[in-house]
Each structure stands twice: as C-alpha cells, then as structure tokens.
From Swiss-Prot:
Catalytic residue list: 129 (proton acceptor)
Residue sites binding heme b per the record: 291
Name of this chain's protein: Catalase-peroxidase
GO biological process: cellular response to hydrogen peroxide; hydrogen peroxide catabolic process
NCBIfam families: cat_per_HPI (TIGR00198), PRK15061.1 (NF011635)
Gene Ontology molecular functions: catalase activity; heme binding; metal ion binding
One CC-aspect GO term: cytosol
Disordered: annotated segments: 1-57
Cross-link Tryptophyl-tyrosyl-methioninium (Tyr-Met) (with W-128): where in chain: 250-276
Family statement drawn from the similarity comment of this UniProt entry: Belongs to the peroxidase family. Peroxidase/catalase subfamily.
Cofactor dependence: heme b
Matches recorded under CDD domains: catalase_peroxidase_1, catalase_peroxidase_2
Leader sequence residues: none
C-alpha cells in the first residue's frame, strides 16, 4: 500500500484525514495523504524483505477507529490505580524544588553549555512550547499532561533541542520522583527561570498529572515537516489546527511560508494566538516578554549538519536528537531554528529593552549564518553581548514576527503603550504567561500548591458553596416535587444532559456546575433546544425557590437540574420494571452571567452531539466519527458510549424532537429496545431519499417503514466492535445490566466537572 492512498484512514488522530481532517478524529476541509505511520512525517516501517504486516487499517482504511477511547488506560500506568498525585505532591518542599531548579539554570554543563551562563531562555522556551499547543476549538494540546515527552511533539521542528532542556531537568525529576510530575516540572522550569532573572510572576498552580502515552491529536494533514497543506487560501488555514505549518507551535518566525513580510505575519500571529485563547494585548505581551530573554541558534546550515530528531535517532542516541556536526555542535556552534537572534543587551535580566530596541532602530532584511531570513538594525552599534565570548558584541537583530509588533497598527499601539509604561507591560506579561501555562487545567479547584492566585475570568469561576447541602430526606422530597411538576421524562433528561455534556476533559471546561445552561451563550444553542429550556428552567427555578424559602438546607439550580434528570431516569427504569437509585452528590453552585465570558464559551458549542442525535447543518464530517470525538471529550469508554446511546434513545432525548433512533414502542421507558430492534432479523436498512444522514428500517415482508435512524444509530449494528457491545445489551438477560450500566455512565457524565469529589 502506498502512503498516498485514495481511501484515507478514519484514524484515532483524525477522521477521513483526506476529506475532513480534525478531532482526535477530524475537522473541516483540509486534505491529507493518509500517512500510515503514527507521525505524519515519519515513513511507515518496513518488514524484512520489503513488505510489512498488513493491519486492519490497511485492509479497511475507512473503518471507524475506537482506539482513542481506550488510550492511557490503567494498563499503561506504572504507578497503579491507587496512586494519588495530590497526596504525593503534599509531601513536596516546593521551595527546595525551586532552589534546585535555579541551581540547574545557573550551572552550565559542558555537554550542552548555557547561553550567557544561564539556561533561563531555554527553559522559558521549553515551558512555552509545552503549553503553547493548546487550542480553544477542542481543548486539545497544552501542558496539562506532559505530552511534550512523546512523539510527535518531542520531535517537532519547533521543539528542536528542547530534548536537551528536559535532560538538564532530569536530575531534579529523579531526586523528587513522583512528588513532582513531568507535566508540572516542564512548565515550572520556565516560571522559575523568569523569577531567577528578576521577573515577578503572577503565580503558579501545580496539579498536572503525567500520561504514559501520547494523546492522539490531529495536528494537521501534512506528511512532511513544515508542510502547509492546511491553507485553504492565502490568508486562511483550516479551523481544525492551531499553527500555520506542520511541526510549529504558532507561526514561521521567518514570515508566512518563509516570506519575510511583518505585516502579513501579523495576520497569522493574530489568528494562531486567537486559537490559543489570547487577545491582542496578551499576544504582544507574550512575544515581547518571552523575547526579552535568551537567543535563537543558527550557527550553520541545518540541512548540512543536523541529524535526525529524537524519534528518528539511533538507539545509542538514547532519546536525544538533532545532533550537529557543525564544529563542536554545541554552545556557539549550536543550530536550532537556523535563526541567529539575540533580542536585547540584557538577555538574562528582565527589562523593557525589547521594546526600546524594537522602536529604537530601523531594520533591514538579512540572513543568519544558517541562511534564515532575519532583520538587523541599520546604522547601529554592536551592543548585544555574545553568548559565549565576553569580548564580542553584535548588532541588534529581530525576527520578522517581532517586527509585526511594530508594523501592525493594533499591535503597534499596544507595543508603544508598553514601551512607555514598563510596569503595565510587566503585569500584562505576568498575567498572559500565567494564562498560557494554565489554560488547559480547568478551574482553580484543581490547582495544588501555595502560589495559586485569585481566580481569573478565563477560568470559568463558580461561587463557593455558602449554604447547608441537602440530605437524603430533602433529595427524596425534591425528586417527588420534580416528578409532580408536569415536566416529562424526556424534558428532564435532555435538560440535565445538555447541562452536563458541555464538559471537555481535554481542558476541563464545561459541565453542569455553574448551571450555565441558563446563561448565554449556552441557553441559545440550537442543540440545547432553547424553546424547551424556556419551559423547563422556570419550572425548576420555582421548585428551587419554594424549597429554599423553607429554611435550612438549600439547593442550587445546578444541583436541581442534575437531580431532576436523575429522578426522571429512576422513573423510566421503574416503568421498565427495574428499581434503581441514581447516585446524587450535591455541591454544585450557580454562576452568574458576569462570571461567564460569552466569547470564551462559544467554542464549547458542539458541532455534533450524537447522544442527542444532533448534527450541525452543513457538517461534512461523518456523524459516527463525531460520535467518537464527543465520547472522547466526555472521557467515556466504548461500552459507556454504547449504553448511553441506547438509553438516551429510549428516553427520547434527541434534540429538536427527532425520532431517529427511537427504536421502541415505549418511548420514555428505560428499556434496551434500541439494541434489540437494531439487531433484529427480518428488516432491511435503506438510506433515506429525502433526508440527509437518515436511514429507514423496513419490514422485509411488507416493505413498510418501521423506524428511522441516523448513521450514528446504524454504526452500532455495522461496526463489528460496536455490534459486539450492542449484542451484550440486546440479550434477554441484559435488562437489569443495561439499566445499571446506563445509570453508572449517566452519573459519570453528571459528575465530570465535580473536581471537589476527587
């Protein structure tokens, strides 16, 4: 099989990467070549003799890939299921840890010498690049799991020689063991580096737990490093990616596609930083603040001297890559990006010199010793110190993307304000840096350690509990009130699901806590059925008011929405002949509109929610692929996904009143009818001639339509793995198991954002 096959795989990294590209699974309109290797830029392995064993993916490249739902299972975790990072971290002396990191920063090693005698610039880049992969549209990327240790991130061109930074930190990690995760250490190193060079940071939160295999993420359609097939026009690239080229964190520092045009570069800087949740002020602060320190490395031509990246390096390299044959290959002879730029004359001290130098000179285009396009100050004295020879000085230099901060009108206004107000710049950088490092960590309730600052708006704050929580008798009384309210099982279940299922385990956003289902923008999302919410929410608010007015314990609307849905599930199970109690743990609170950044929350609106049989109009990606993506964001296993689909179909929880997949004569009753009727003989399925993504099940004898369904429904009979799961729940002895498993999965979703229960 060639690497450029017509039937591109529906992979765990992407979808039909050729047509839809994105998700763990994939998005929108970029194209790909369907590389068969884990990393799009690494050739497929070959077996001895020229061939290689063929996998199921080779034989059936469009087969739905469920593997993403079982990554990082307990089987790959060497620490065991009982390990608690929070408990181990509690034993850590964080001040001693900081001292040890500082000692690493200021102790130059012969095998990889420190620029200017200080590894600060290197560690800032390490932390920035660990966190900077975060993207708002699906919450993937970021520093939250230490994924930079693994392919493909450990071998991205933009991460060249960061393997050395991690190796420098190994003695610290080795000393403290499991008290500090790699994920925390990778970003703490940059924070400590800033402080060691005189900068006052905004704060720091520990709590990132390591993974033991990389998260499957669609980084782009290209099969070469620095490829740019993601562009759909000169000024636009696919919405499903975060950077402008494969293997970059943001943009090409030489300019778009190597074109040294600062104005054009500004357009792409703005877009890539927006996709990382940064506005213009935060963008300027981050670029200028980060480039106050350290230097880039381009002592020679990389193609002539630099060896393979870590994942492609030989065994004896022991995980290190990019070995250089240029002179000594290290220190003054280092080749990383190919650019040779030192931004300020105080590269190991916090200062405002970046802006002073940026605006203090006119700039002309030149090339580095490595042949990369960069800029040098016109008619300037040599004021920039050499990183290794104290007798040498250099003229000021800048990157094309640095000049964007002066050329772009909006960036220039901010930059000049920072130039004239250094304290304002310092605070802006401190806050933006804190946001960069913590954007994918969720609410501050997940943070550990003594340096956590006050909650910021971008952390989706919810109030603290300020009332007595309901007990068992209160819960029983409230359930009775809900079931007497006239609201239907379908209304209660679908509202609770809508409230909870906005959660994304990728960046720990969304969920039922806060009751933001009643606030904008979630209240107006089509998938949440605003007209139904206009009936359900006032009825629940009235029950809440009456209960809270009685004195004693109180209940938040966030808790009541979940409790009401759970009461409906219990009733539906009872109607099916199964008695069950849905676990309920109070403690959610109600956020206000002022605590809710509308623009920030818009990215949580689902393009599809297969659990409600919802597909955004015009969506091009296969619905069944988006099902797996949604299940992944909800941190569900394949069995949990399966039982939830069957139960929610039985409960008529579809968006917009759709009847697709409601394969039962007893809607609203928690039966396994979805599975029994889906797998029943004596019927044939046919694509609808009138409705896109719809199918009809017809009686073989009469040809009459018995049911309608979506592609998501049919996949549970079509895909062999999902059919195996469906058969479990379609069996005659599965009635109680189905209900119990549904309740367990339902409760899991309702509590996905209850970090206080961990």
């Amino acid at each position: 099989m060639s690497d450029t096959q017509d039937n591109a795989p529906v992979s765990a990294q992407g979808v039909d990467q050729k047509a839809a590209a994105g998700c763990p699974v994939a998005h929108d309109s970029v194209t790909a070549h369907g590389s068969e290797s884990e990393s799009p830029a690494i050739d497929s392995p070959s077996a001895v003799g020229g061939g290689r064993p063929r996998t199921n993916r080779d034989w059936w490249p469009n087969q739905l890939d469920l593997s993403v739902l079982s990554t990082n299972s307990a089987k790959v975790n060497p620490l065991g299921e009982d390990f608690s990072y929070a408990k181990e971290f509690a034993k850590l002396d964080v001040e001693a840890l900081k001292r040890d990191i500082t000692e690493v920063l200021t102790t130059s090693q012969d095998w990889w010498p420190a620029d200017f005698g200080h590894y600060g610039g290197l560690m800032i880049r390490l932390s920035w690049h660990a966190a900077g992969t975060y993207r708002i549209h699906d919450g993937r990327g970021g520093a939250g799991d230490g994924g930079q240790r693994f392919a493909p991130l450990n071998s991205w061109p933009d991460n060249v020689n960061l393997d050395k930074a991690r190796r420098l930190l190994w003695p610290v990690k080795q000393k403290y063991g499991q008290k500090i995760s790699w994920a925390d250490l990778l970003v703490l190193a940059g924070n400590v580096a800033l402080e060691s060079m005189g900068f006052k940071t905004f704060g720091f939160g520990f709590g990132r737990e390591d993974v033991w295999e990389p998260e499957e993420i669609f980084w782009g359609p290209e099969d070469t490093w620095l490829g740019d097939e993601r562009y759909v026009s000169e000024k636009e690239f696919s919405a499903g990616v975060g950077a402008t080229e494969m293997g970059l964190i943001y943009v090409n520092p030489e300019g778009p596609r190597g074109n040294a045009d600062p104005a054009s570069a500004a357009h792409f800087i703005r877009e890539t930083f927006r996709r990382m949740a940064m506005n213009d002020e935060e963008t300027v602060a981050l670029i200028a603040g980060g480039h106050t320190f350290g230097k880039t490395h381009g002592a020679g031509v990389a193609d002539d001297h630099v060896g393979p990246e870590p994942e492609g390096a030989p065994l004896e390299a022991q995980g290190l890559g990019w070995m250089s044959s240029h002179a000594s290959g290290v220190g003054a002879d280092t080749i990383s990006s190919g650019l040779e730029v030192t931004w300020t004359d105080r590269p190991t001290q916090w200062s405002n010199r970046f802006f002073e130098i940026l605006f203090g000179y006119e700039w002309e285009l030149t090339t580095s010793p490595g042949g990369a396009k960069q800029w040098v100050a016109k008619d300037a004295e040599a004021i920039i110190p050499d990183a290794y020879d104290s007798t040498k000085k250099h003229k000021p230099t800048m990157l094309t993307t640095d000049l964007s901060l002066r050329v772009d009108p909006a960036y220039e206004r901010i930059s000049r304000r920072f130039l004239e107000n250094p304290d304002e710049f310092a605070l802006a950088f401190a806050k933006a840096w804190y946001k960069l490092l913590h954007r994918d960590m969720g609410p501050v309730s997940r943070f550990l350690g003594p340096w956590v600052p006050q909650t910021q708006l971008w952390q989706d704050p919810v109030p603290a509990v300020d009332h007595e929580l309901v007990g068992a008798a209160d819960i029983a009384a409230l359930k009775a009130k809900v079931l007497e309210s006239g609201l239907t099982t379908t209304q209660l279940v679908s509202t609770a699901w809508a409230s909870a299922a906005s959660f994304r385990h990728t960046d720990k956003r969304g969920g039922a806590n806060g009751a933001r289902i009643r606030l904008e923008p979630q209240r107006s999302w089509e998938v949440n059925q605003p007209e139904q919410l206009a009936t359900v929410l006032p009825a629940l608010e009235e029950i809440q008011r009456e209960f809270n007015a009685a004195g004693g314990a109180k209940i938040s609307l966030a808790d009541l929405i979940v409790l009401a849905g759970s009461a409906a599930v219990e009733k539906a199970a009872r109607d099916a002949g199964v008695e069950v109690t849905v676990p309920f743990r109070p403690g959610r609170t109600d956020a206000t509109q002022e605590q809710t950044d509308v623009d920030s929350f818009r990215v949580l609106e689902p393009r599809a929610d297969a659990f409600r049989n919802y597909l955004r109009p015009g969506e091009k990606t296969q619905p069944e692929v988006l099902l797996v993506d949604r299940a992944y964001l909800l941190n569900l296993t394949a069995p949990e996904m399966t039982v939830l689909i069957g139960g929610l179909r039985a409960l008529e929880a579809n968006a917009g009143g759709s009847r697709h997949g409601v394969l039962t004569d007893r809607p609203g009753v928690l039966t396994n009818d979805f599975f029994t009727n889906l797998l029943a003989s004596g019927a044939r399925w046919k694509a609808s001639e009138s409705t896109e993504h719809a199918y009809e099940i017809r009686d073989v004898a009469t040809d009459k339509v018995k049911w309608t369904a979506s592609a998501v429904d049919l996949i549970f009979g079509s895909n062999s793995q999902l059919r195996a799961l469906a058969e479990v729940y379609a069996s005659e002895d599965a009635r109680e198991k189905f209900v119990q498993d549904f309740v367990a999965a339902w409760t899991k979703v309702m509590e996905l954002d209850r970090f206080d229960l961990a």
